[in-house]
């Protein structure tokens, strides 16, 4: 795509930077803001929606949540990785980019974020919300994903549970176990 139809940059947030990318920034219709999955994913996988920005004459705003993609990493400040921070970040993005009216789309974790934002913050100007592959219950999701661990070899199950308990996902054992889990239960090889 031509550079004149894409605007990207950073907005400041809590001393960090939130990366954003707007496709068709001069579109005439109300912008669509996309909250990505994860936590830990990025805005990149939503490029498939770029053509829609022009077909509908609508700006599409994608951004990387704090600690993800091109946004500042807050490690070792992982205490910032919580729903309040991410809701504040979405508010901040809207304010800094002048997004008074929006349509909001959330995928996976981004759908949870969108729901929390709507229910907890009751923001003005959200005209619609679209949820995609969003879990309805975090406790049920955790229960079911932990049930799937029983199908893994014990050393992989232990590596995944140890990482989750310690909130440390850096070990090779974790990455190998997660890759196997992903292959079996989510969508094939990386």
Placement of each model-derived feature along the sequence:
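N-terminal cap/lid segment of alpha/beta-hydrolase-fold proteins
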Residues: 1-17
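Flexible "cap/lid" loop of the alpha/beta hydrolase fold
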Residues: 127-168
